[in-house]
Amino acid sequence: MKAGFDHEKYLEEQSKYILERVNNYDKLYLEFGGKLLFDFHAKRVLPGFNENAKLKLLYKLKEKVEVVICVYAGDIERNKIRGDFGITYDMDTLRLIDDLRSYDLEVNSVVITRYDGQPATTVFINKLERRGIKVYIHRSTKGYPTDVDTIVSDEGYGQNPYIETTKPIVVVTAPGPASGKLSTCLNQLYHEYKRGRVAGYSKFETFPVWNVPLKHPLNVAYEAATVDLKDVNMIDPFHLEAYNEIAINYNRDVEAFPVLKRIIEKITGEESVFKSPTDMGVNRVGFGIIDDEIIKEASKQEIIRRYFKTGCEYKKGHVDKETFERSKMIMEQLDLKLEDRKVVLPAREKSAKLREVSNKNEACPAMAIELSDGTMITGKGSHEMDATAAVLLNAIKYLANISDGIHLISPVVLEPIRNLKSKALKIKNSALDCEEILIALSISAATNPTAQVALEKLSMLDGCQAHSTAILSLNDEQIFNKLGIDVTSDPEYATENLYYNS
């Protein structure tokens, strides 16, 4: 897909704007909403956007920046998972620290928010401290969010410890939403002013894009991505009243603004410089858009992708019916159909043909991949391998101009692996999944030059689209993500077996 977004222009504009904001204060607490790293949603809806743009931005400012990571104790206790990586929030925190350090960015500390002695959280705290990570514990703020007099007092923010920082910009981030970032920023403002320092707060959140129309697919795609949070985009009424200008924000920020403004005014002892929640933001992503039509089409595709994802989550019992229905309503707003995702029909047609040939009324999983040149490649499940493995092999064979009749992996390699699964490990389904087939292919490549040529084509799948007629296992989904393939699934299980890796 062609670029519709200028990454370099955006980085320049964004870093300049943040530095302008920090000039007004001794210290700026910058709340980072959304994903700090691996923001694949932004990459999909803004072709040309780098998924680690925020990290690259911080690297440009690294002499002035240190990072505080917030983790909500309840998320650790219930093993909340980051969907795009399939890892828990505590593990994602460790990964985030490693990634920040790899860019020479200073990680100040981890703040455990709303801690109440949860056992799993205590273990996590011990793990961090024994690895030399500074940990601060914040308990629930008394009076929050409505009793401003109690919140801004020694009984409220004063009860939580002050985080010692040294740089002029303190980035406050988290593995996911509702982790206590805002509360941590305000807690710090309270302590800074108690110490006689002038500190400020700003918010850096990519979506919704404030200077893009309300019903633009880019902003609608944000609603599709947050159906579980029930976020609704809206015109910022405070911004309209103050400046007679239309700016887009979302319901939670708009609803929280009056109280947030009062808290800041109580802390600082003077009228807030912010006239609206949009004023608090420093987001300049809208200025990086160079082709609106490309952005619109990419955003529509993301809305369809999110509908499939929500459908699968509903099937698994992870979201309620209201969330699924809301996802459907968003599709209807833009008059989108599932078949507008080009790769869907070839996969379904392949599955239908397999069912017709088998003459059985049961699921016949199939997959399709759309290559960068628009070619559709399909794959089906068999005794040797599942549909995910088959479609990957078929795709790289096509890219390497290898005939269908040539086997990339010798039975001498395949059979021992299948025997290991069925006999030694006693796994009922001995068909190889996509990870196993790639390992088998790499072994074959050591002695088979044709397999080596095919293996080298895997990188060409980065950015391709894929669709499965059955819900993928978590492992298969992760392999496709690692290969850079955007994959969706129909909300149907591959078998009637209840013990399914989902």
Curated annotation (Swiss-Prot):
InterPro entries: DUF1846, DUF1846_C, DUF1846_N
Pfam families (UniProt xref): DUF1846, DUF1846_C
NCBIfam families hit by this protein: PRK13663.1
Family under the similarity heading: Belongs to the UPF0371 family.
Name the record gives this protein: UPF0371 protein Clos_2302
Provenance organism: Alkaliphilus oremlandii (strain OhILAs)
